[in-house]
């Protein structure tokens, strides 16, 4: 039995989700393994959300937020960046590959960046496999 990888993407409503939506309306090709979770701001994404996604079956998790200096909620994306780094450190301490988690910054007009993020995290998922 072959399992299909699952990539969870936490996308802020303003930019990350806008880029995902633009990719969809533009009929961009990217792996169907991505599951998008729309959040008001990436500043609302905590370490617990990332770890829960992994615990519930995600092979990789990424956050798609506003470009640095352009967060609609001032510095939510920077707060999330610190949390992603903390999550990676915690995973490493637990013996889990920190490469399973990433953050990307993009504007709502950058569908290509969203597609590239999905493809990169899908490839990482295939390389790393599921969590045991």
Swiss-Prot record:
Domain of life of the source: Archaea
Keyword field: 2Fe-2S, Electron transport, Iron, Iron-sulfur, Metal-binding, Oxidoreductase, Selenocysteine, Transport
Free-text cofactor note: Binds 1 [2Fe-2S] cluster.
Alphabetized Pfam families for the sequence: FlpD
Cofactor(s) needed by this chain: [2Fe-2S] cluster
EC id: 1.12.99.-
Keyword Kinase: no
Gene Ontology MF annotations: 2 iron, 2 sulfur cluster binding; metal ion binding; oxidoreductase activity
Assembly and interaction partners: The F420-non-reducing hydrogenase vhu is composed of four subunits; VhuA, VhuD, VhuG and VhuU.
Protein family membership: Belongs to the MvhD/VhuD family.
UniProt name for this protein: F420-non-reducing hydrogenase vhu iron-sulfur subunit D
Native species: Methanopyrus kandleri (strain AV19 / DSM 6324 / JCM 9639 / NBRC 100938)
Lineage of origin: Archaea, Methanobacteriati, Methanobacteriota, Methanomada group, Methanopyri
